[in-house]
Amino acid sequence: MSSEFVISMAEKAVYVTLMISGPLLAIALLVGLIVSIFQATTQIQEQTLAFIPKIVAVLLALIFFGPWMLSTILSFTTELFSNLNRFAG
C-alpha cells in the first residue's frame, strides 16, 4: 500500500463527507440567515425563533436528500470494501 493510495483514499473520504454534509449545512445556513434578517427587521429577540426553523428545515432536507446521501455513502463503502485486499496486502 503506497502513500499515494492512502492519500487518494483519504481524499475520497473527505470529498464524500463534504458532499453528504454540504446540502444540509447550506440549508441550515440559508434558513439561519433568513431568520436573522427577520429578527433584525422586526426586533424580535426570541432565542427559540432561531433554532426551530433550522431544525425543521434540516429535517425536511434530510428527508429530501436522504436517499441520495445514502446511495453516495453506500457506493463509497462498497468501493472501499471491494478494494479491501489492496489495503491488507
UniProtKB/Swiss-Prot annotation:
Transmembrane intervals: 18-38, 55-75
Keywords per UniProt: Bacterial flagellum, Cell membrane, Membrane, Transmembrane, Transmembrane helix
Location in the cell: Cell membrane; Bacterial flagellum basal body
Recorded family membership: Belongs to the FliQ/MopD/SpaQ family.
Name the UniProt record assigns to this protein: Flagellar biosynthetic protein FliQ
Entry membrane topology: Multi-pass membrane protein
Its job: Role in flagellar biosynthesis.
GO biological process: bacterial-type flagellum assembly; bacterial-type flagellum-dependent swarming motility; protein secretion
Keyword Cell membrane appears in the UniProt entry: yes
UniProt organism field: Bacillus subtilis (strain 168)
One cellular-component annotation, GO: plasma membrane
